[in-house]
Amino acid sequence: MELNSVLKNSFEVDDAIDHLRSLGLFPHHDRVKSWDTRKMIDTINGADRNSFILDVGCNDSPILPMLRRLGFKNLYGCDLFLNTITYPALMKIVHSFYKRNYKPIIETYENKIFAISIQDLEKTNFQNNMFDYITSLSVIEHGVNIQNYFKEMNRILKKGGMLLTSSDYWPNKLVNKIISKDIRKMSPNNVFSKEEIEKDVIKAAEHNGFTLTKSIDFTYEDKVVHWKGGRNYTFIFFALKKE
């Protein structure tokens, strides 16, 4: 499996789901997001269980519960919002596989299993050089200032730490800025094009002290993601290392 790559087809989603299940985990409640979830989990899974890990935009993300199940201890999350609702689709999936209770993020936050905070990922209150890994699962397309993002992630990552980012992608530019009335459930502000990834995103990362762990495989086949209003695209994932 190529680490830094574009989601090519639905078969890669199926493979990711099977792989997560083989680890005793569960698919992402948005099925297609299991692809980049798997990449993040696989990248971190070989690390020391005492590593400090932050999931930005954690509210609808399964990353922290998955890492907890794999034995990681120092797990942090931040988001602008923390919903007080449960996720019926996610609960149904988990119950069908494991026949036991699974607590969504807000409940684990209330029970202090994770260190979850409400704050802006562009300007957090975390200490300098605090984290070994930071995960960002489909976050940066939602109105995040890319320069501020990489600057802040560099500040709070340890030297040699890794920033794992996924986002919406299509090689040619698609129409952007379609936002729902409820900002917490907004559709993607931006589906990044190949030119934007190369000239804007990766250049900004390099400017802020990051390097790609490996060049990105931009090979694609299908529009695997289907959003309301006829917006069809795919995902991209890339891992960056702090120099």
Model features per residue range: what roles?
Residues L164-E195:
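Conserved class I S-adenosyl-L-methionine
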Residues L54, S61-K123:
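Class I SAM-dependent methyltransferase SAM/SAH-binding core
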Residues N208-F210, K214-E243:
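Core SAM-dependent methyltransferase catalytic element
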Residues E2-A47:
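Class I SAM-dependent methyltransferase Rossmann-like catalytic core
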Residues P188-S215:
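Short alpha-helix
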Residues D132-V144:
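A short SAM/SAH-binding and catalytic strip from SAM-dependent methyltransferases
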Residues Q119-I134:
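A short acidic, Gly/Pro-enriched loop at the edge of an enzyme's catalytic core
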Residues Q147-M162:
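A short glycine-rich, Lys/Arg-flanked "PGG" loop and its adjoining helix->strand segment in the class I
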